[in-house]
């Protein structure tokens, strides 16, 4: 059962972040010890395939993309720059993508080199696990993820402190239902301006 829910004002995901205290992230770690962050994984342990995580139906509709075409086009683009195996991971229902089925678990099991996705939370999961991510549309790791697949063999990975700063911010964007009912979520979002500028239609 989910305890925390992402709350975003003016967007579908947070795409920017700023300095925030670490208290809510520490609270998240007490609830879910696997949220502890240990930094970049050693390259020798993660020198395997590319994991391509496909978008689900909702973002495909929102961004007006054809999932199958995106997969074939992205595989073709990756092939220009690497001979690594490409594993395609389809986004299933929540039970099929948590615990031993999580992105992090697959990254460890298959020694994944990097994760490529459209705008899935898989990018955050991969970077939290300790490997680089590539994203193609706005998402919560926008400012730290790789954008060009030309860098697939030499990807950027943020400094430890930089990624922790993002985790602290995102923890201030996750709330329990009781925090929403009490008004705390809205108070923090408005008081700390935890949102992007409004999308112009």
Q: Where are the regions that the model predicts?
A:
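Donor nucleotide-activated moiety binding/catalytic core segment of transferases
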Residues: 79, 84-134, 138-139
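Conserved catalytic-core segment of nucleotide-activated headgroup transferases in glycan assembly
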Residues: 39-95
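Leloir-type glycosyltransferase catalytic cores
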Residues: 4-47, 63, 144-201
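Glycine-rich loops and low-complexity Gly/Arg-rich segments
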Residues: 75-78, 140-143, 158-160
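Short catalytic/ligand-binding loop motif for oxyanion handling, primarily in non-cytosolic enzymes
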Residues: 3, 59-62, 94-97, 124-125, ...
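A short, gly/pro- and small-residue-rich
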Residues: 1-14, 72, 128-142
């Amino acid at each position: 059962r989910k305890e925390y829910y992402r709350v975003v004002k003016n967007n579908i995901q947070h795409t920017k972040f700023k300095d925030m205290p670490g208290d809510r992230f520490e609270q998240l770690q007490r609830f879910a010890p696997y949220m502890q962050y240990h930094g970049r994984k050693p390259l020798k342990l993660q020198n395997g395939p590319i994991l391509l995580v496909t978008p689900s139906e909702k973002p495909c509709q929102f961004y007006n993309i054809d999932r199958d075409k995106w997969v074939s086009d992205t595989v073709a683009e990756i092939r220009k720059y690497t001979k690594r195996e490409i594993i395609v991971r389809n986004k299933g229902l929540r039970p099929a993508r948590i615990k031993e089925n999580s992105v992090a678990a697959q990254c460890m099991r298959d020694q994944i080199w990097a994760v490529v996705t459209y705008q899935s939370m898989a990018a955050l999961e991969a970077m939290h696990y300790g490997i680089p991510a590539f994203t193609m549309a706005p998402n919560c790791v926008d400012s730290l993820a790789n954008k060009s697949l030309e860098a697939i063999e030499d990807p950027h990975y943020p400094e430890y402190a930089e990624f922790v700063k993002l985790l602290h911010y995102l923890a201030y964007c996750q709330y329990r239902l009781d925090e929403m009912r009490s008004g705390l979520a809205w108070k923090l979002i408005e008081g700390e301006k935890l949102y992007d500028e409004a999308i112009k239609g």
